[in-house]
A protein has these predicted regions:
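Short alpha-helix
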Residues: 147-171, 175, 207
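Hydrophobic beta-strand segment of the Class I
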Residues: 98-99
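C-terminal lobe and adjacent flexible extensions of AdoMet/dcAdoMet transferase-like proteins
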Residues: 193-234
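Conserved catalytic loop of SAM-dependent methyltransferase domains
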Residues: 169-194, 202-204
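Class I SAM-dependent methyltransferase Rossmann-like catalytic core
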Residues: 1-34
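Conserved class I S-adenosyl-L-methionine
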Residues: 126-155
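Class I SAM-dependent methyltransferase SAM/SAH-binding core
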Residues: 34-88
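A short glycine-rich, Lys/Arg-flanked "PGG" loop and its adjoining helix->strand segment in the class I
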Residues: 111-126
Length: 234
């Protein structure tokens, strides 16, 4: 499956796509139960997961990368914009929460994208990545939207976040439902999740990781500024 907006819209209209949305959304809300008064950005194809924030957050924006294309969402008052990974069209530190779904794995330069997300995230803000698990069936099957681009082991995600001045704070997994499930199996999604979390935790379809700005990343510009001042006085 190509990671473009049209294919993803079609996937989330299927029985297995709707089940996947429910399973992932459930874990997302456990990690982020409250967004009242916050400014929320969804990056990638995050719109299936942003609806709960519309009635709570101060502001919700869905940014879709140029190579993916864009769809109008929600109906009647579109909040979607198109942007480039290397230059997100926002000022610094404007979002309190950033949700990334179908975004990191397809990025041309994942580190550059994460540095841009760091730039637009508020100092006390949080980013939540939903990324395909390299060990899962969802990352192996061609018809799966989580098989596009680069899948990740947990350690790879951890290293990538730390390299881009994020500090991982919470980890979770979701999506034990097989990607080839028909309507009948898709209805049993909650049962698949319970069994998978208990007996096969490493085979979840996606990793979920919440991260904040690292103290090193926040302190570094100040240290550089002091060093430059000292050199200027010398």
């Amino acid at each position: 499956m190509q990671l473009d907006a049209g294919n993803l819209v079609d996937f989330y209209e299927t029985a297995v796509g709707q089940a996947a949305r429910r399973m992932i959304s459930h874990r997302l809300r456990l990690l982020w139960p409250e967004s009242r008064g916050l400014r929320v950005l969804g990056y990638g194809f995050a719109i299936p997961y942003l609806k709960p924030f519309l009635g709570e957050a101060e502001r919700v924006v869905a940014l879709m990368p140029a190579q993916m294309g864009v769809v109008a969402w929600p109906a009647g008052r579109p909040l979607t914009v198109l942007g480039e990974d290397a230059a997100l069209p926002f000022a610094e530190a404007v979002f309190d929460r950033i949700l990334v779904v179908h975004g990191l794995e397809g990025a041309d330069a994942a580190r550059l994208l994460l540095r841009q997300l760091w730039r637009v995230l508020a100092p006390e803000g949080r980013v939540l990545l939903v990324a395909p698990n390299r060990a899962s069936l969802w990352a192996q099957m061609e018809a799966s939207p989580f098989a596009c681009g680069r899948p990740f082991h947990k350690g790879e995600l951890d290293a990538l976040l730390r390299d881009t001045l994020f500090e991982p704070l919470q980890w979770d997994r979701a999506l034990y439902l097989p990607p080839f499930s028909g309507r009948r199996l898709a209805r049993m999604g909650a049962g698949w999740e319970r069994l998978g979390r208990r007996f096969l935790p490493g085979l979840a379809g996606v990793h979920l990781v919440e991260a904040g700005k690292s103290l090193y990343g926040l302190a570094k510009p100040q240290k550089l500024k002091r060093a430059e001042s000292a050199l200027a006085r010398a």
